[in-house]
C-alpha cells in the first residue's frame, strides 16, 4: 500500500505528461502520426489517466458545469475505473456532475446478463460512486429491430444536447476497432448496429464459453461521434496489441484500421505499456531513428531484424546491409560484417539444445542449462490445466524422458472455460452410473438443475464449479499420465483468487502466494518453468506469474534457491522473439 501511495503521488505530479503534444515533433518519433506516451506498466498508466479524468471532473464542478464522459469497456480501462473508485472513496471525488455515454453494447443483450456491458460498468464503476442513475447512458441491447435506427439516432442526439463529449476513453481491438467500429467503418458513421468481425468474436469466446455464444451484432458509437469529443485517450496494454497500435499510429488512415482515423483528431493521446508499444519504430528499431548505444541485447535484436527484413541468413549479411539500415556505428564498433555475423550465429546456436535439464557428462560452457545435478527436480507451473502441454509440451516430454523428477503445478482450476453443455453431459453420465445411489443422484440432480435453470445474469453454483474443475483436472491427469508423470507429482493448487465464478477475478492475496511457496519449499526445485505470456497484463497468465514472482521473492534467502533457475515459456498467446530466446529445445 505504501509503494502504491508513493506511485500515485509521483504520478499526480506528472499527470500532465499524457497531455497532448504534436505527434512526430521529436526526431525519433518522426514516423508517428498520433501522440503516444509509454509507461513501464499498465497500472501506472491507468492511474495517470484516472487523474486526468478526475481533474476534468473537478474543473467542471468549479465552473458549475456538467462533465460529459465517453466510457469504454473490456480489460483495458478496469484499472482506470479502480482508481476513480478509490479517489471517490478515499479523496471525496464526486461524480454528481458527471454524465456518461458508453461506447457500445452487444446485441441482443439483456442488461442483467453478466456478459453485458451494462453489467460490466455497474460492476466496475457505477455501483461504487455517487453518479446519478439518470446520468448513465449505455446502449440498450434489448431495443427491437424496428426501433433500432431511431434509437441510435437519438443516442447521438442526446450527446449533442449535452454539449458533446468532453472526454472519450477508448480501448483498441486486435482488428483496430474502437468501440465496435470494425474494419470497413466509415469516418462519417454515427451510432448504429454493426456485425462483429470474427476476430472480435473469437477474442470474446472465453467470456461467453465458446464463440457460438458470442452475439454476432452490437450497437456502437460511430467514428464521427467519437471524433467530435474534445479530448480522446486510447489505452492499449500487452503484446497482443503491439502490431495494431503500430498500424494505427504510424500507418496511413484507412477504413481497414478504424483506429487510424484518430490521426484526424487534434487532441488524442495513446497511453501504452511497454509491451503494447513494442512495434513502434522508435521501440522496435530505434537505430533507424536515433543514435543508440549498442549493447549485446540490442545487437542481437538488430541483426535478427535485419535478417528478417532482407530475407537473408545471418552469415550472408554484408557491410552494405548494415550501413543501409542505420547500423554503421555498430559496424564501426564491432565489425566488419563477417565478425558480427559469426558472433551472432554462435550466440543463437548456443541457445539450441535437446537437453532442457542439462546434458550429463558434457561441457556446459556454451549450453543454456547446467550439467549438474544430472537428475534435477523440476516444477512446471501451468496457469490453466493445459498451458503446460500447449506451450512447452516438447520440453515437458524431454524432461520426463531424460529422467528428471518433474512436478506439474496447475495454478487455477480452469473451471470457467468449461461450457455448460459439457458439464451437463458429464452430470448426466454420472446420474446414469449412480442411479441406484439416492444420495448421489440427489446431488447430481441439483447440479443438473443448476445448469439447466441458470439465468444469464447468474454465476455457476459451487457444485457446478466443482464439477467443471474436476473435468479440467482429469483432462490434465490424462496428459501427465501419458507423459509418464506420477500422479503424486501433479499438484492442483486451486489458487483462491480465481474462484469467483465469473470473469472478474480477485486480486492476488497472501493465501495464493503461500500455496505456491509451500510447493516450492516441498520440492526444492533446480528448475522452475512458468508461463511468461504478457499478451493480457490483467489476464490470468500474468496474475499467476506475479504470484510466482512474489513467492520467489519471499524464498530467495533459502539455500536451495541458489541452485534454482527460472525459465519463462510462451506459446498460448504468443512466442518469444528469436533474439529473446535463451533456450530453444
Language model features with spans:
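Structural motif
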Residues: 68, 99, 166-167, 231, ...
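ATP-dependent adenylation/pyrophosphate-handling site
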Residues: 95-99, 103, 378-385, 389-465
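Conserved phosphate- and dinucleotide-binding cores of soluble alpha/beta proteins
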Residues: 1-13, 40, 44, 58, ...
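Short Gly/Thr/Asp-enriched flexible loops that form oxyanion-binding sites at enzyme active sites
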Residues: 80-87, 178-190, 538-554
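Metal-dependent de-N-acetylase/amidase catalytic core
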Residues: 201-209, 214-218, 311, 316-379, ...
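Glycine-rich N-terminal segment of FAD-binding domains in flavoprotein oxidoreductases
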Residues: 59-90
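Long, low-complexity, Lys/Arg-enriched
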Residues: 1-35, 277, 285, 294-351
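N-terminal glycine-/serine-/threonine-rich phosphate-binding loop
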Residues: 1-68, 363-365, 372
Amino acid at each position: 500500500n505504501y509503494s502504491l501511495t508513493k506511485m500515485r503521488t509521483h504520478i499526480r505530479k506528472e499527470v500532465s505528461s499524457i497531455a497532448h503534444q504534436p505527434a512526430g515533433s521529436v526526431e525519433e518519433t518522426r514516423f508517428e502520426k498520433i501522440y503516444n506516451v509509454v509507461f513501464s506498466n499498465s497500472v501506472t498508466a491507468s492511474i495517470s489517466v484516472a487523474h486526468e479524468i478526475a481533474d476534468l471532473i473537478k474543473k467542471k464542478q468549479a465552473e458549475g458545469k456538467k462533465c460529459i464522459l465517453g466510457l469504454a469497456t473490456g480489460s483495458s480501462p478496469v484499472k482506470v475505473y479502480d482508481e476513480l473508485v478509490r479517489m471517490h472513496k478515499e479523496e471525496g471525488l464526486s461524480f454528481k456532475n458527471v454524465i456518461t455515454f458508453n461506447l457500445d453494447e452487444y446485441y441482443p443483450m439483456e442488461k442483467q446478463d453478466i456478459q453485458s456491458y451494462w453489467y460490466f460498468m455497474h460492476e466496475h464503476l457505477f455501483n461504487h460512486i455517487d453518479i446519478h442513475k439518470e446520468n448513465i447512458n449505455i446502449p440498450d441491447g434489448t431495443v427491437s429491430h424496428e426501433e433500432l435506427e431511431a434509437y441510435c439516432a437519438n443516442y447521438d442526439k442526446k450527446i449533442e444536447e449535452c454539449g458533446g463529449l468532453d472526454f472519450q476513453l477508448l480501448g483498441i481491438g486486435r482488428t483496430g476497432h474502437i468501440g465496435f467500429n470494425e474494419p470497413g467503418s466509415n469516418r462519417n458513421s454515427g451510432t448504429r448496429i454493426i456485425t462483429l468481425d470474427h476476430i472480435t468474436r473469437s477474442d470474446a469466446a472465453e467470456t461467453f464459453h465458446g464463440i457460438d455464444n458470442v452475439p454476432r451484432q452490437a450497437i456502437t458509437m460511430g467514428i464521427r461521434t467519437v471524433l467530435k469529443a474534445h479530448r480522446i485517450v486510447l489505452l492499449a496494454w500487452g503484446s497482443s496489441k503491439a502490431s495494431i497500435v503500430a498500424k494505427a499510429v504510424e500507418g496511413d488512415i484507412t477504413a481497414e484500421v478504424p483506429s487510424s482515423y484518430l490521426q484526424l483528431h487534434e487532441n488524442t493521446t495513446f497511453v501504452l505499456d511497454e509491451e503494447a508499444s513494442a512495434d513502434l519504430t522508435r521501440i522496435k528499431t530505434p537505430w533507424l531513428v536515433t543514435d543508440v548505444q549498442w549493447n549485446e541485447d540490442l545487437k542481437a535484436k538488430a541483426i535478427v531484424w535485419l535478417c528478417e527484413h532482407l530475407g537473408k541468413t545471418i552469415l550472408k549479411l554484408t557491410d552494405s546491409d548494415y550501413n543501409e539500415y542505420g547500423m554503421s556505428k555498430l559496424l564501426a564498433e564491432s565489425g566488419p560484417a563477417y565478425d558480427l555475423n559469426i558472433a551472432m550465429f554462435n550466440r543463437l546456436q548456443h541457445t539450441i539444445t535437446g537437453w532442457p535439464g542439462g546434458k550429463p557428462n558434457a561441457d556446459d560452457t556454451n549450453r543454456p542449462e547446467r550439467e549438474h545435478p544430472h537428475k534435477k527436480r523440476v516444477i512446471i507451473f501451468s496457469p490453466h490445466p493445459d498451458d503446460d502441454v500447449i506451450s512447452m509440451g516438447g520440453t515437458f516430454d524431454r524432461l520426463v524422458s531424460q529422467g528428471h523428477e518433474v512436478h506439474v503445478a496447475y495454478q487455477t482450476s480452469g473451471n470457467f472455460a468449461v461450457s455448460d453443455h459439457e458439464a451437463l453431459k458429464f452430470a448426466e453420465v454420472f446420474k446414469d452410473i449412480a442411479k441406484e445411489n439416492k444420495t448421489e443422484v440427489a446431488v447430481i440432480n441439483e447440479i443438473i438443475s443448476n445448469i439447466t435453470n441458470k439465468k444469464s445474469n447468474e454465476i455457476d453454483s459451487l457444485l457446478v464449479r466443482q464439477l467443471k474443475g474436476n473435468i479440467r483436472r482429469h483432462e490434465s491427469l490424462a496428459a501427465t499420465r501419458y507423459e509418464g508423470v506420477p500422479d503424486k507429482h501433479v499438484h492442483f493448487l486451486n489458487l483462491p483468487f480465481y474462484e469467483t465464478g465469473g470473469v472478474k477475478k480477485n486480486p492476488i492475496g497472501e493465501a495464493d502466494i503461500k500455496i505456491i511457496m509451500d510447493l516450492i519449499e516441498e520440492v526444492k526445485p533446480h528448475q522452475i518453468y512458468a508461463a511468461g505470456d504478457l499478451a493480457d497484463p490483467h489476464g490470468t497468465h500474468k496474475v499467476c506469474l506475479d504470484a510466482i514472482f512474489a513467492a520467489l521473492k519471499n524464498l530467495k534467502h533459502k539455500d536451495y534457491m541458489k541452485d534454482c533457475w527460472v525459465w519463462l515459456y510462451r506459446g498460448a498467446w504468443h512466442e518469444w522473439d528469436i533474439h529473446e530466446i535463451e533456450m530453444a529445445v
